[in-house]
Structures are given as structure tokens and as C-alpha cells.
């Protein structure tokens, strides 16, 4: 979505809410409580963006008690034609809520104007359409949300397929509510998947967390995968900055086979 102009009608609708800059703590609390929250809308992500030379701001929408009810982390970077603002998997607001979206859009516009940004682009972390494993739609798409953004001056950039250059638009989610144990969960997968899990168990595969000095291993594995799956890998420096920004909240995992342990267990 790209943001353009607002109208007098929108300004009147936003009068019930106030916009102010949130502290890092306020924003993290908002993100944690919001159904639209995620790691890309956190203070840690702001630290990561700042390490790349970007300016960041926590734009918050507060109620009459000054309590945050919606907001967005905006990262401003120098583009080819001027400063550009990005809301990664944001804003933290229901796109179908006309009043809150109107007020928040006004606040985002003002934040962009203060840094002379030429555009704002957002990737809302809100479901547009739920599909089954075969790709069949299970409900009507949320076109009302798209129309609401457009009413506020945002322009829809269209849908994409496959790996996106900036943001993943497709998410596969496994509903675990119907399973009471690991055995039932495993049984729900296809035969080939169950066989691969069994092979991994019998082969002594171990999963562990890498420390910072081992991130080159993670990078090299991603590089091999990117060549096979045709997506762009990140640099080792990027992974190190993610590690530094998120601390214990970021886990870089690796699966290993320790042949000596495997052979010893097989002999026993």
C-alpha cells in the first residue's frame, strides 16, 4: 500500500483520537497485545533499522485516557528520488476500523511530512484471504479492508506470487487446536513427511542454537538454499546485526548429525 492525500472528511473522522509518538516500551507493549503485532513492529526492529542508517519513529494512536490503541513503527530511508517511509507488517491497527485508520493515517502523514518523505509504503499484517492446503479459498477475501485503505489515500500495489523482494505476503499456518499430543500431530502429515521425521530421529539429528561466532554457518546454509530455491540471501553482517538487535529473542538454529554419537548409540 502507498499513501497519498487525505480529505476534510477524514480529518473530521479522526478528531476522537489523538496521535503522539510512543516510547519504545509503550510500542512494544502495544505490539505484544495486538493481533497484528510481530517482530517487525518492535523496538528491536527499530534498532536493526537504525544500524542500517534509517530514521525510525513510533507513531501512536491514543484514546481519551492517553492509552495506546494503535500505532506503527515507521522506518525512513533514502531512496532514489528522496526519503521513503516503510511500515513492515504494519500498522498495528484493524484495517477495517474506519475511525482508527483515519486518525492513524493522518498521524503517519504528518510524520512523513516532518522528514520530507515522498512516500509511505505499508504491508499490513492482516489476513486478506484464508486458503486451504490446496489453495482453495475458505472464505471471502477481505476486500473491504483494501477499499478502506484506498479511501484514506493509500494505493494498492497489487498482489504477487512466490518470494517477494521485500516482504513475505503468504504464510502457511498449521492449526494445532485439534491435536492433543505430538503423535497426533505427526499423523496429520503426509506419508513422505512422516518418513522423513522418522529417518531424522533414527539418524541422531540434533537441533541447537548457534552463538554469534557461528553465524557464518547459518549464512552459508542459507546461501545454498537461496541458490536452489531462487531467493536472495542476506549478508553475514545482516545476520550479526539481527543477533545484536534482538538478543535472546532471536534464535538461529541448526540441525546436525554427530556421527560419533550416532555410531555409539547404534552399537549400544
Give the label of every model feature segment.
Residues 1-18:
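Short, low-complexity, intrinsically disordered N-terminal peptides in bacterial proteins
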Residues 81-164:
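Acyl-donor binding region in acyl/amide transferases
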Amino acid at each position: 500500500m502507498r499513501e497519498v492525500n487525505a480529505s476534510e472528511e477524514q480529518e473530521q473522522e479522526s478528531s476522537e483520537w489523538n496521535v503522539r509518538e510512543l516510547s519504545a516500551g509503550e510500542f512494544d507493549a502495544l505490539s505484544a497485545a495486538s493481533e497484528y503485532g510481530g517482530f517487525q513492529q518492535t523496538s528491536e526492529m527499530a534498532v536493526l533499522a537504525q544500524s542500517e542508517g534509517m530514521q525510525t519513529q513510533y507513531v501512536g494512536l491514543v484514546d481519551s485516557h492517553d492509552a495506546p490503541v494503535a500505532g506503527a513503527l515507521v522506518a525512513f530511508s533514502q531512496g532514489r528520488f528522496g526519503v521513503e517511509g516503510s511500515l513492515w507488517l504494519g500498522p498495528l491497527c484493524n484495517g477495517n476500523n474506519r475511525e482508527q485508520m483515519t486518525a492513524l493515517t493522518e498521524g503517519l502523514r504528518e510524520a512523513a511530512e516532518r522528514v520530507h518523505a515522498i512516500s509511505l509504503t505499508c504491508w499490513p499484517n492482516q489476513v486478506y484471504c484464508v486458503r486451504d492446503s490446496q489453495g482453495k479459498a475458505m472464505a471471502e477475501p477481505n476486500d473491504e479492508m483494501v477499499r478502506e485503505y484506498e479511501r484514506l489515500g493509500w494505493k494498492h500495489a497489487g498482489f504477487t506470487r512466490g518470494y517477494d523482494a521485500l516482504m513475505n505476503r503468504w504464510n502457511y499456518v498449521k492449526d494445532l487446536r485439534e491435536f492433543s499430543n505430538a503423535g497426533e500431530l505427526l499423523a496429520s502429515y503426509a506419508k513422505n513427511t512422516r518418513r522423513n521425521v522418522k529417518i531424522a530421529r533414527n539418524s541422531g539429528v540434533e537441533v541447537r542454537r548457534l552463538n554469534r561466532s557461528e553465524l557464518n554457518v547459518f549464512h552459508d546454509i542459507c546461501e545454498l538454499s537461496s541458490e536452489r530455491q531462487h531467493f536472495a540471501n542476506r549478508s553475514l553482517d545482516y545476520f550479526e546485526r539481527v543477533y545484536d538487535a534482538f538478543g535472546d529473542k532471536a534464535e538461529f538454529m541448526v540441525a546436525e548429525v554427530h556421527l560419533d554419537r550416532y555410531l555409539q548409540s547404534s552399537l549400544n
